């Protein structure tokens, strides 16, 4: 007979204290709350930006004021009061010293506790890291080594001053300010983020990584990332993020733009672990992100891989514009929701080039009373003959109160292309757990094994450093007390 007491704990097995929920006590420089033209001008002046960036911001702000927040997602959350949002908050810099000179021991200790290597360490894998704390970057590692090969990797704020021509040419070219409500907001008030340029015929010798940490309780984080891979180049980019544990909501609205030229490859991997709120649905980060890549040249390739385990609300659709002949777009995703979390995420694969290909593999895991939605668009234009798409969207339900939805949208405008879509939903039930228990495997181990197998197709696509972290993170999320 099945142990009802133990099996009833399946729904709660995801509940594990959030290990990154600590906050760092530091002195902070803050702008007044709210989003308005005065704040935008103050921010641009503070960052000593050229006029074209201020114009870009102000234009975006005017667009944003006329827009309405999207309500088509399968999401339910309190209305965001932008008058209560801090657009800019940064640790106070000591007078006469730059950011690198004034990284306090507290901030260094924070990143070390998070496992982010911003100090040289021969024991750790060699990864170039840009560490962003609230509204500013505290420097990028391995810059000198990368510059020797012509690779630019720095904060977006530094790039605006040092490489204005590249910024002017590419900023907003893939995600224009008016693309959507949150992209317009980001374009108006973006603070920091990363910039990367890989020159022709260069394979980046190390993985590039940016780590985002929200520390201030009232601050929003509005980072901007821009990556350009010139002809015959290759780069792996890794992104991670965490936030303290508060009983109020924080806002994260980011934009990522990728440009990939002939025979170039960009692999963009994310482990998203913002605070998700407590088991009553209190607190957590509102995560509204726009990510898009352009495969401009022949044989160009962009691959998005993501593990989404955090945030109270997630609204995110990494996408590919496949313009080049024989270009390739890929999307590999695991989204794990628990308690009252809600995620509406997916991808767009837009085919314009002949013989272009796209692959979508999405895995959704839902526990508690969470809602997990996949929303996808595949569009093959009339000019994209002999193109091919395959999509696989699978869902795994844990317990009886969770919800899973899949909304595929397929448009094929020529008769010489092929689209495949398949999906299935399954539930971890008492019988499966009982089967494992009969072989001496406890509930937590059983759940870990089931979920690990379910996610294997995606986790195998992550770089080794992230794959290890991803498996560890899934196991942490799946741990809980067994009655």
Swiss-Prot record:
GO cellular component terms, semicolon-separated: chloroplast
Top-level taxonomic group: Eukaryota
Keyword check for Cell cycle: no
The keyword Plastid is annotated on this UniProt entry: yes
GO biological process: iron-sulfur cluster assembly
Localisation: Plastid, Chloroplast
Pfam family, any one: SufBD_N
SUPFAM superfamilies (UniProt xref): Stabilizer of iron transporter SufD
Keyword set, alphabetical order: Chloroplast, Plastid
The family this protein is said to belong to: Belongs to the iron-sulfur cluster assembly SufBD family.
Entry-linked PANTHER family: FES CLUSTER ASSEMBLY PROTEIN SUF, UPF0051 PROTEIN ABCI8, CHLOROPLASTIC-RELATED
Protein name (database record): Iron-sulfur cluster assembly SufBD family protein ycf24
